[in-house]
């Protein structure tokens, strides 16, 4: 496994991360039945990835994304919290909602997330996220309080990620790209501002 420094966070993460969609169950009716391992099975899969060198685990809040946080928390407890980097997120855009989401995620995980993203930020919610006591302000507040280590914005829109790259409150960005859809990634690679932030890519296999 190869590793990279994640921007200026000081985190060194595996090039291949573990996204927790394949281990979740509950409240996700669009997923087929095989996406339903129990906790023991889910922990075994995550441990196998860890033994192959993966140290970055990306999840999202219960209940919207099933029980993945709970299973990841069980894995972190078994393997040792200091051995992995936990990236978490919630699709909330106001400051109050985001603040409460982080508290709930921390309870589900049984530990403090390393990175927490406002998830799937779109043009309809962009100004809310970056505005006065929006999600960005709440994440910065949570970081100052030690409830998360780093702040993040996740989006499918280049202009929103660029806005995050210009924002001193934001440490890490997350966008989508894969071998079939490289348009946004190519633009990001050409923009020097993105080199000042950590960047995670999701949907690299055009799946979860």
In which residue ranges do the predicted regions lie?
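N-terminal binding-site loop/beta-alpha segment at the start of enzyme catalytic domains
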Residues: 1-84, 144
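Feature marks short, surface-exposed loop/turn motifs that line or immediately flank catalytic pockets
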Residues: 22-25, 63, 92-94, 119-124, ...
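Hydrophobic faces of well-ordered beta-strands that scaffold small-molecule active sites
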Residues: 14-18, 57-59, 84-88, 113-118, ...
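CE4/NodB-like, metal-dependent polysaccharide N-deacetylase domain
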Residues: 99-117, 141-145
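Beta/alpha (TIM)-barrel catalytic core signal, keyed to glycine-rich beta->alpha loops juxtaposed to Asp/Glu
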Residues: 3, 119-208
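Acidic-and-aromatic substrate-binding clefts and catalytic sites of carbohydrate-active enzymes
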Residues: 60-69, 91-98, 124-127, 178-185
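Short, acidic/polar
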Residues: 34-49, 95-109, 155-165
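Acidic (Asp/Glu)-rich catalytic clusters
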Residues: 7-10, 51, 73-83, 102-112, ...
């Amino acid at each position: 496994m190869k590793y990279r420094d994640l921007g200026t966070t000081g985190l060194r993460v595996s090039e291949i991360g573990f996204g927790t969609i394949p281990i979740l169950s509950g409240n996700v009716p669009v997923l087929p039945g095989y996406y339903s391992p129990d906790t023991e099975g889910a922990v075994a899969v995550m441990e196998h990835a860890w033994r192959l060198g993966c140290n970055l685990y990306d999840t999202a809040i219960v209940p919207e994304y099933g029980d993945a946080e709970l299973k990841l928390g069980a894995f972190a407890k078994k393997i040792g919290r200091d051995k992995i980097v936990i990236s978490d997120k919630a699709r909330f855009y106001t400051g109050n909602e985001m603040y409460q989401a982080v508290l709930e995620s921390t309870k589900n995980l049984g530990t403090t997330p390393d990175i927490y993203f406002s998830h799937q930020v779109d043009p309809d919610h962009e100004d809310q996220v970056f505005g006065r006591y929006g999600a960005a302000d709440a994440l910065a507040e949570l970081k100052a309080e030690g409830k998360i280590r780093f702040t993040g914005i996740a989006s499918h829109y280049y202009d929103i990620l660029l806005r995050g790259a210009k924002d001193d409150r934001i440490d890490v960005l997350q966008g989508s790209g894969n071998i079939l859809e490289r348009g946004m990634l190519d633009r990001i690679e050409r923009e020097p501002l993105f080199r000042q932030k950590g960047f995670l890519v999701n949907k690299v296999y055009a799946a979860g």
